[in-house]
C-alpha cells in the first residue's frame, strides 16, 4: 500500500507538472504570436513608407491644400432656398489627392481632387446618383474654377448633373471661403448656388 501511495504521488506530480507546462504554453503562445504579428506589421509599414514615391503636384493642387480643414456655412440656391452646409477637406493617398466630404441639408457627398496629366481635376460623387468629372478651367491667386469634363459619359440635354464649381479663398482671410456651383437639368436649364463658409476651429 505504501508503495502504491508513492507511485500515486509521483504520478500526480508528473500529471500536474505536465498540466502546468501546458497552461504556461497556453499563456505564452498568444503573447509570442501577438509580438510576432506586431513586428511583422510594423516591419511592413516601415518598408512600405520607404518605398513610397515623392508625389509632385500642380500649383493648383498646392493652392487647394490651403483650404484643408473643416468648414460650416449656408448655401443659397437660385430658387431662394437656404441650406445648412458642412464640409471637410483632407490630403490623402500619400499627398496625391484631396478628399472633400460635403453635407448639404443632411445629405452626404464626396469629391476627390487630384492631378491628371499635370492638371487639377475632380470626381464628384453626387446625391443625384452620378459621378460628374470636372477639370480646372481657370486659376487666380484667390480662386480655382472647374468646368465639366465629358470623359465621365454624362451628357447635357439628357442627364441632370453638377457641371460647374468655383472655390474662392483669400489666404489673407484664412477663415472665410465662398463656393459657387451649377447643376444642369435635362432640359438644359441651370440651378445655381452660392455657399459662404467659415472655418471650424
Q: Which residues does each PLM region occupy?
A:
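Bacterial Sec-dependent N-terminal signal peptides
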Residues: 1-4, 11-46
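Short, hydrophobic/aromatic-rich segments at coil-to-beta transitions
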Residues: 67-72, 93-100, 118-123, 141-147, ...
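Short aromatic loop motif centered on NTY/YTY
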Residues: 136-173, 180-185
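Helix-adjacent hinge/juxtasegments
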Residues: 106-137
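N-terminal mature ectodomain segment of secretory-pathway/periplasmic proteins
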Residues: 82-109
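N-terminal helix-cap/turn-to-beta initiation motif at the start of protein domains
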Residues: 55-70
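Edge beta-strand at a domain terminus
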Residues: 45, 176-201
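Beta-turn initiation residues at beta-strand->coil junctions
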Residues: 75-78, 101-104, 124-127, 148-152, ...
Amino acid at each position: 500500500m505504501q508503495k502504491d501511495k508513492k507511485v500515486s504521488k509521483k504520478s500526480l506530480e508528473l500529471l500536474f507538472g505536465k498540466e502546468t507546462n501546458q497552461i504556461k504554453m497556453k499563456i505564452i503562445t498568444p503573447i509570442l504570436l501577438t509580438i510576432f504579428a506586431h513586428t511583422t506589421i510594423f516591419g511592413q509599414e516601415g518598408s512600405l513608407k520607404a518605398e513610397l514615391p515623392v508625389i509632385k503636384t500642380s500649383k493648383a493642387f498646392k493652392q487647394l491644400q490651403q483650404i484643408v480643414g473643416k468648414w460650416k456655412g449656408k448655401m443659397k440656391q437660385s430658387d431662394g432656398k437656404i441650406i445648412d452646409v458642412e464640409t471637410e477637406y483632407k490630403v490623402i493617398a500619400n499627398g496625391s489627392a484631396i478628399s472633400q466630404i460635403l453635407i448639404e441639408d443632411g445629405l452626404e457627398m464626396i469629391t476627390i481632387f487630384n492631378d491628371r496629366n499635370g492638371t487639377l481635376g475632380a470626381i464628384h460623387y453626387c446625391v443625384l446618383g452620378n459621378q460628374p468629372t470636372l477639370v480646372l478651367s481657370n486659376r487666380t491667386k484667390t480662386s480655382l474654377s472647374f468646368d465639366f469634363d465629358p470623359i465621365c459619359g454624362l451628357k447635357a440635354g439628357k442627364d441632370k448633373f453638377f457641371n460647374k464649381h468655383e472655390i474662392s479663398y483669400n489666404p489673407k482671410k484664412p477663415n472665410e471661403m465662398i463656393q459657387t456651383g451649377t447643376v444642369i437639368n435635362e432640359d438644359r436649364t441651370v440651378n445655381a448656388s452660392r455657399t459662404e463658409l467659415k472655418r471650424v476651429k
